[in-house]
Swiss-Prot record:
Subunit text: Heterodimer of LeuC and LeuD.
UniProt superkingdom: Bacteria
Function per UniProt: Catalyzes the isomerization between 2-isopropylmalate and 3-isopropylmalate, via the formation of 2-isopropylmaleate.
Name of the protein in question: 3-isopropylmalate dehydratase large subunit
Family the entry assigns: Belongs to the aconitase/IPM isomerase family. LeuC type 1 subfamily.
Obligatory cofactor(s): [4Fe-4S] cluster
Organism taxonomic ancestry: Bacteria, Pseudomonadati, Pseudomonadota, Betaproteobacteria, Nitrosomonadales
Organism of derivation: Methylobacillus flagellatus (strain ATCC 51484 / DSM 6875 / VKM B-1610 / KT)
């Protein structure tokens, strides 16, 4: 039998049938939130259809939920309608939903793994581009469009073309203060936001194996920002130990059989990839984006690049436009860039490990006077409860950070948390596009430690200086 990649194994084991170069694949887990599901539920109602497999669906409101006082509900009428519609649809169709006020409520890509609803070997879909997060478990996970959401609800299947396979190997040991977020940004800086287009990426190598599940989720979350369809990491003891005992994990009598299968979920020796990228872990430093695309990124001790030195005219004009939007001058040291707001949260970096890293930097310090708002938004009610049990909320509050309720928050301008025009934000989210965090807002993507460091310094600063 020929050697297979992890992607081959996951894709091939879910093919129902193939014709004309496309495959009908079976979907094991369907995660749902309030933004991309109402049209799908409406379509089912109009056609008189039921959900094909209701126990495969798990729903949670996240994009529109307020992160401040929830006792008065949701102020914005459109946001409120989306969340209420999800509640009603879940009641009508018998779907399990973790509603606002439930401690399990949170960002869909934090909630799924936390509940053990994401398991190795699964196909996982959600009407959300950052579904690639779940690939950290040795699963095939990707975002789908709203019409596909309805298709999966009705048939449990999806028509897919098989992607090419790329392996990104990160060998060596990451330095202190260098995180999975820095690895993700460094990779995107190297291959570009189109570097992974048409590929499913497997992240491998000793540096990846040494990451926690939280770190692996951060990395796979950003695979989509490299243009990839999916990101994934092979199963090992770290994966299995994380899943064990979670509410949706296999029960004790099925556990050994599940683990035996999960241990096969890695690329075989000699498996052929369509592309291989190699990066040395020691070369990666804390990263900061300077432009309006995740590929516009550099190390903290570097400078804002000069478009006049770029020979490609298309790239040059893109850089010029980005610098104009961001209000930055070429050759400015990154550490000289002052900030107005700090956002620690999102499906990229709102898990307990992320909050611990930020708290370690903030402890005993205070948010700088020029920073108007520094906010910490846990990824779920359970993450929030654990952080409070560990006293992290006290560290943040004493340092002048706001401690919020779980949700997508300032990752995107779809709720009350947003930037005003011209405001500059150090953000642990995943996209720095124009207007992503609010019209005219300027986003710099960083790790949680780097965001906390920027909050206390009032400008970007090498987090390693504060950790020494």
């Amino acid at each position: 039998m020929s050697a297979k990649t992890l992607y081959d194994k996951l894709f091939d084991s879910h093919v129902v049938r193939e014709e004309n170069g496309a495959a009908l694949i079976y979907i094991d887990r369907h995660l749902v939130h309030e933004v991309t599901s109402p049209q799908a539920f409406e379509g089912l109602k109009m056609a008189g259809r039921k959900l094909w497999r209701v126990n495969s669906v798990l729903a949670v409101p996240d994009h529109n939920v307020p992160t401040t006082d929830r006792s008065h509900g949701i102020a914005d009428p459109i946001s409120r309608l989306q969340v209420e519609t999800l509640d009603q649809n879940c009641r009508d169709f018998g779907v399990t939903e973790f509603r606002m006020g439930d401690v399990r409520q949170g960002i869909v890509h934090v909630m799924g793994p936390e509940q053990g609803a994401t398991l190795p070997g699964m196909t996982v879909v959600c009407g959300d581009s950052h579904t690639s997060t779940h690939g950290a478990f040795g699963a095939l996970a990707h975002g789908i469009g709203t019409s596909e959401v309805e298709h999966v609800m009705a048939t449990q299947c999806l028509v897919q073309k098989k992607s090419k396979a790329m392996q990104i190997r990160v060998e060596g040991q990451l330095g202190p203060g260098v995180t999975a977020k820095d690895v993700a940004l460094a990779i995107i800086g190297k291959i570009g936001t189109a570097g992974g287009t048409g590929y499913a990426i497997e992240f491998a190598g000793s540096a990846i194996r040494s990451l926690s599940m939280e770190g692996r989720m951060t990395l796979c979350n950003m695979a989509i920002e490299a243009g990839a369809r999916a990101g994934m990491v092979a199963v090992d003891d770290v994966t299995i130990n994380y899943v064990k005992g979670r509410p949706y994990a296999p029960k004790p009598e099925q556990w050994d059989a599940a683990v035996a299968y999960w241990r096969t979920l890695h690329s075989d020796e000699g498996a052929k990839f369509d592309a291989v990228v190699e990066i040395k872990a020691e070369d990666i430093e804390p990263q900061v984006t300077w432009g309006t695309s995740p590929e516009m990124v550099t190390a903290i001790n570097s400078i804002v690049p000069d478009p006049s030195k770029e020979s490609d005219p298309t790239k040059r004009s893109g850089m010029e436009r980005a610098l104009q939007y961001m209000g930055l001058q070429p050759n400015t040291p990154i550490s000289d860039i002052p900030i107005d707001k700090v956002f620690i949260g999102s499906c990229t970096n709102s898990r307990i490990e992320d909050l611990r890293a930020a708290a370690a930097v903030a402890k005993g310090k205070h948010v700088a006077p020029n920073v108007k708002l520094a906010m910490v938004v846990p990824g779920s009610g359970l993450v929030k409860a654990q952080a409070e049990q560990e006293g992290l909320d006290k560290i943040f509050k004493e340092a002048g950070f706001e401690w919020r309720e779980p949700g997508c928050s300032m990752c995107l301008a779809m709720n009350a948390d947003r930037l005003e025009p011209g405001e500059r934000c150090a953000s642990t989210s995943n996209r720095n596009f124009e207007g992503r965090q609010g019209a005219g807002g300027r986003t710099h993507l960083v790790s949680p430690g780097m965001a906390a460091a920027a909050a206390v310094a009032g400008h970007f600063i090498d987090v390693r200086q504060l950790l020494n």
